Regions:
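Alpha-helical elements of the RecA-like P-loop NTPase motor core of helicases
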Residues: 20, 73, 177
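Papain-like cysteine protease catalytic cores
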Residues: 44, 49-161
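Deubiquitinase catalytic domains
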Residues: 129-243
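Short, amphipathic alpha-helical interaction segments embedded in low-complexity terminal/linker regions
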Residues: 1-70, 79-89, 96, 218-236, ...
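Short, well-structured alpha-helical patches and their helix-loop capping segments
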Residues: 6-7, 124-128, 171
């Protein structure tokens, strides 16, 4: 069964470079050329001029998004529309996309029947992930670069689609924040933030990676695999990924640290 270069690139992106997994996605028809065309597009988002300032006059900063189970959606919303309360709208866009393309977003892809997934993702208590970033990248027509603090790796959703712009998100293992270029100082008004960048802008990418590296050095990330954690909000001890995720969903606490016995 043949498949296009665009399909192969998208499969590699979704599988984080794991060739065997990417091949399965292509051969089994989970990612197809049709699937790359089934997402509605957002109305044009005006790009605000910031008085001619370039990234050289700016500093990359972390813009904190509320830990309300919609951090992924609101982080994207801040970068694209300067809106931290856009979760319900973006959840509905994703739900409609999944519901209208059941041949593309199959149960094998979603882990749930498309109708069930559409209902599930509109529940404000549920978290978004890679599928949502993939769809939102196509909806806005831009690359969404999610930088994982622990690995210092940049996962690019929309790579190879010839989009002209990109945004940056910061991921600590359970929570997404937005990254923005502040006007000269981290304390500059957020209204002057630059949140969209040319897709090929290496300087903004390196600045975003530098923020992640600094946070990694300070161990400001959550290692969910096999370690003992402590909730830094209520001080509860937790064991591994399942307990941490369950605690986060039940309490909205999303600040964890590794537990070290004295």
């Amino acid at each position: 069964m043949g498949f296009s270069v665009a399909v192969a690139l998208k499969a590699l992106e979704v599988s984080h470079g794991e060739v065997e997994n990417a091949l399965d996605l292509c051969v089994n028809g989970i990612i197809t050329d049709e699937s790359l065309e089934h997402v509605p597009t957002a109305p044009p988002v005006p790009v605000t001029s910031h008085g001619g300032m370039t990234t050289a006059n700016r500093v990359m900063v972390r813009r904190v998004i509320d830990a309300d189970n919609s951090c992924l959606f609101n982080a994207v919303g801040y970068c694209m529309e300067k809106n931290r309360r856009i979760g319900p709208k973006l959840r509905k866009i994703i739900a409609d996309c999944v519901r209208n393309s059941p041949d593309v977003y199959t149960e094998a892809v979603l882990g749930k029947a498309p109708k069930q997934y559409s209902d599930w993702i509109q529940d404000p208590a549920q978290w978004g992930g890679e599928i949502e970033l993939f769809i939102l990248s196509q909806y806005y027509g831009c690359e969404v670069v999610a930088i994982e603090i622990k690995s210092a790796h940049a996962y690019v959703y929309g790579e190879g689609k010839n989009y002209s712009r990109r945004i940056y998100l910061l991921y600590d293992g359970v929570h997404y924040d937005a990254l923005a270029m502040a006007a000269g100082s981290p304390t500059a008004p957020e209204s002057l933030d630059m949140t969209q960048f040319p897709a090929g802008d290496e300087s903004s990418k390196q600045a975003a990676l530098a923020v992640a590296a600094e946070l990694k050095e300070g161990r400001q990330f959550v290692d969910l695999l096999g370690c003992t954690l402590r909730c830094m909000v209520c001080n509860k001890g937790l064991s591994g990924q399942e307990e941490a995720l369950l605690h986060a969903r039940e309490t909205n606490h999303q600040n964890f640290g590794e537990y070290k016995s004295s």
